[in-house]
């Protein structure tokens, strides 16, 4: 496999996770991304001093491999629980789903470690 090279299209979560696993297996990998930054739907954009999440506002963890990645990110301070409240008229109640997570300081914090 020494002369085999891999091209991964897209530096979002799926593309970077794929490239990361290939690199861990000592494969030669090149990631191609058309945007200026990493993240895809988990991208954090900047305009001057303002940073904002450009795509997904939160993630959920449903698969075991992704849950392990989220647990590592949580311990490293790159992920935090998000407990939104639903508002209607003058009433508010907790959202029905408990495993909503947000990247810290932005969603792209979840993909940056995979790009190393």
What do the predicted segments below correspond to?
Residues 2-4:
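Core beta-strand elements of the Rossmann-like FAD/NAD(P) dinucleotide-binding domain
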Residues 7-11, 20-48:
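Glycine-rich FAD pyrophosphate-binding loop
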Residues 15-16:
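N-terminal Rossmann-fold NAD(P) dinucleotide-binding loop
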Residues 40, 68, 112:
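Alpha-helical elements of the RecA-like P-loop NTPase motor core of helicases
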Residues 44-86:
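N-terminal FAD cofactor-binding segment of flavoenzymes
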Residues 58-65, 79, 87, 91-113:
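Short beta-strand to alpha-helix junction loop
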Residues 116:
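A conserved beta-strand/loop element that lines the FAD pocket in flavoprotein oxidoreductases
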């Amino acid at each position: 496999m020494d002369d085999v090279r891999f091209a991964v299209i897209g530096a979002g979560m799926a593309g970077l996770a794929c490239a990361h696993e290939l690199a861990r297996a000592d494969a030669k990998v090149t990631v191609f991304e058309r945007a200026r930054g990493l993240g895809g739907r988990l991208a954090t954009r900047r305009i001057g001093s303002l940073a904002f999440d450009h795509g997904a506002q939160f993630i959920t963890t449903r698969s075991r491999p992704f849950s392990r990645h989220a647990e590592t990110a949580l311990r490293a301070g790159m992920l935090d629980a998000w407990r939104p409240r639903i508002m209607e008229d003058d009433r508010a109640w907790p959202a029905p789903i408990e495993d909503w997570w947000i990247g810290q300081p932005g969603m792209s914090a979840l993909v940056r470690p995979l790009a190393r």
